[in-house]
């Protein structure tokens, strides 16, 4: 059998319902009339939301509710082997770019299911700030997961540099005035806690300390560079345009068995400065 899932190629506004068009056929051309389609719907954040602007991160990384399951799908195709699946809006209060993902299987009695996946982009505003860290990656060991991963790292004795754009979903760089940029230090006071059920566990108390704030202007067809001195510790860079926030990925820094914080770039991006 063949299964086709179609959605709108253009990002949809955050207040819209989303429709997927489904078509199933047998390999000899006959429609898969009455066959069952089963699957799942997922909501995921789209940090790299603009393909035309590689390296720029969009969306509030601290925003809750952007990564969750929206339930199961169980429908039957009509006599023409077609169906239309409309997903009612459950994300209109979110401010980050999103992907609505449909993963579905077309079932056949006595045969193997055919599984396909479709992704619909959701864009929460006409334009959003985007942030690109201007420093390289380093392989970092995370003792909690006992694994290494590449993460952006601010070198010792260097500034944390970022490019900021104001762009729409097509990657057009627009002009923006009075974008508010804040550098927040994420203080973590670690301590050990013991319980009979969990034994000894490493925990921390969190406190955010604002270290810098400035207002910037971003030109049309361009970007604005911002630089901040950072000491040992964990940070995030926040960019606010009206009520919309933009965030980059989460960054951490570990070295020789101890955690070395970095700066968390974009609206909530962590980076850790290299103290070695």
Segment roles from a protein language model:
Residues 1-276:
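A structural signal for beta-strand and strand-to-loop patches characteristic of beta-rich domains
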């Amino acid at each position: 059998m063949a299964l086709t899932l179609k959605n709108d190629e253009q990002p949809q506004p955050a207040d819209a319902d989303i429709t997927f068009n489904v078509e199933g056929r047998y390999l000899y051309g006959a429609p898969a009339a009455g066959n069952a389609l089963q699957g799942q719907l997922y909501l995921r954040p789209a940090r790299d939301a603009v393909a035309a602007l590689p390296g720029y991160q969009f969306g509030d990384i601290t925003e809750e509710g952007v990564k969750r399951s929206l339930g199961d799908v169980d429908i039957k195709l009509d006599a023409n082997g077609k169906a239309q699946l409309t997903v009612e809006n459950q994300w209109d209060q979110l401010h980050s770019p999103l992907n609505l993902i449909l993963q579905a299987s077309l079932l056949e009695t006595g045969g193997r299911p055919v599984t396909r996946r479709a992704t619909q982009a959701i864009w929460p505003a006409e334009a959003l700030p985007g942030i690109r860290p201007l420093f390289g990656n380093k392989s970092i060991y995370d003792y909690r997961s006992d694994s290494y991963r590449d993460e952006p790292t601010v070198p010792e004795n260097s500034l944390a540099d970022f490019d900021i754009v104001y762009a729409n979903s097509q990657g057009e760089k627009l002009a923006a005035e009075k974008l508010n940029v804040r550098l927040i230090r994420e203080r973590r006071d670690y301590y050990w806690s013991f319980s009979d059920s969990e034994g000894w566990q490493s925990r921390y108390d969190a406190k955010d300390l604002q270290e810098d704030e400035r207002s910037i202007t971003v030109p049309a067809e361009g970007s604005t560079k911002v630089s901040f001195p950072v000491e040992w510790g964990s940070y995030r860079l926040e960019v606010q345009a009206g009520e919309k926030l933009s965030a980059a990925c989460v960054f951490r820094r570990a070295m020789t068995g101890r955690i070395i914080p970095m700066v968390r770039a974009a609206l909530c991006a962590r980076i850790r400065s290299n103290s070695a």
